[in-house]
C-alpha cells in the first residue's frame, strides 16, 4: 500500500468537477492509486467521497496539510487562484497548492474572469480522460 501513488483531488462549491475526475480515474486506473478528496466545503468533499475517493478532508487546514504529503494534485484551474469559487478558495489554500512539491494536473475550467490562451474548450469528460491518461503515463 505504501507504494501507491497519492493523488489529491481538490474542488469546491458542489464538487462536480472533482467527482467527475475521481469517477474517471477509478474507471480507467481502478484501485491502483490512492485518491484523497479535499473539498473547500463538506458538500464538495461528500460528493467526491461518493465518487470513489479513499479518504476525504474538508477546509483550509486539511488542504494545506494534505498538499504537503501527496505526489500529484488535480482539480479545476481555480484551485490555484485565491478568492476563486465564490471566495471558497482562500489565499492560504491557493498558496499551499501552488507551493506544494506535488505535480499538478489542472482542468482548464473556471468560472472566474480568467481565460487561458491556447487551450481549447473541450467538454469535461474529454478533459477527465486526459487527466487519467497523464496519470497512467506517470505510474
What role is predicted for each listed range?
Residues 13-15, 78-82, 110-112:
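Short glycine-rich anion-binding loops that position phosphate/pyrophosphate groups of nucleotides
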Residues 55-93:
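Glycine-rich phosphate-binding loop
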Residues 9, 37-39, 56-58, 75, ...:
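General beta-strand structural signal in soluble alpha/beta enzymes
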